[in-house]
């Protein structure tokens, strides 16, 4: 079996024009694995730490040359000569090399880039798709896309406090047909916004960022767009929100839509929304530091709607385990760079599934052309993916890769559609 011959890191750019880490792992056979690490705008306090240079003379302090040096130095030295096929063993070496809880010594960006590149190199050497390498022959389920078509919060410069308004196409019996429904709705949304005199500029994730007056106005416009596209809201296409409420939570109070609100008032707000609109999923409805609020909303709405912990769990199995024990949330957003290795990410997904929590594989707002998460979604049979809107190549790349995977799987491909949310009555 071929061994690792070369590990090489370099500084490249993400979709926001910020530096990020790319890693190449080459095997003795010539097989090559390459990976680029994404970065987030609204980040959880407990996320693994991406290492930035802090030199104001380069990229406004956001350079990643230190992380790149770590790849080319200490990491390369540790991995060259090893076989790449035991992902867990490789990742454990990386974790021990770093030696910190949050991967702050070498940088989660250096560690994750290497972890992903090793997996790709091994898959390429074996001549199998990455999803098959990660998930074996059991990876065959194509995910429902949660498409962020209206941006607010930290992802846009407008009045909307909710960070993402998503359409969730569940129709058609195949990923390609659900994607088509989402894309057609996106184009009709653009027409409606133009007719109403709103901007159709797009935000970080390819969604529109109009200066709407309220969350309800955004949801009303989405309902119109779905109908204009010829689909039925609540049947063909559902809705989802990423509130990212940690962004406006301070001293026990939510400063939301011009008012200071308690946890109880926020929960009442969500209750009204899910009665009025076909909302199937709400991400980070409560702050990552408001565990009592999370317990209450899970008790009240947990059988009606998917309650997703992102900032709450930061893809960390230890924190997820605590959430499960305390009855907090019923789903987890999974982001590779929140935890920092492929193995730990797979562990988190496995734990979620064992305890009947949904797992949604997710991009970051600062993305790249890398399509690793498309393969991860299929490998884990996660059933849901968040990878932005129907514009910007960094988002479309993931959808196109899923189309290729669906084609490759042929009759073996499965798309659950509405059944992904069978547990919820909203």
UniProtKB/Swiss-Prot annotation:
InterPro entries: Enolase, Enolase-like_C_sf, Enolase-like_N, Enolase_C, Enolase_CS, Enolase_N. SMART domains: Enolase_C (SM01192), Enolase_N (SM01193). SUPFAM superfamilies: Enolase C-terminal domain-like (SSF51604), Enolase N-terminal domain-like (SSF54826). It catalyses: (2R)-2-phosphoglycerate = phosphoenolpyruvate + H2O. The active site is at residues 205, 335. It comes from the Bacteria. One of its GO terms (cellular component) is phosphopyruvate hydratase complex. GO terms for molecular function: magnesium ion binding; phosphopyruvate hydratase activity. (2R)-2-phosphoglycerate binds at residues 163, 335, 364-365, 386. Its EC number is 4.2.1.11. Binds a second Mg(2+) ion via substrate during catalysis. Belongs to the enolase family. NCBIfam families: eno. This is Enolase. The lineage of its organism: Bacteria, Pseudomonadati, Aquificota, Aquificia, Aquificales. The gene is eno.
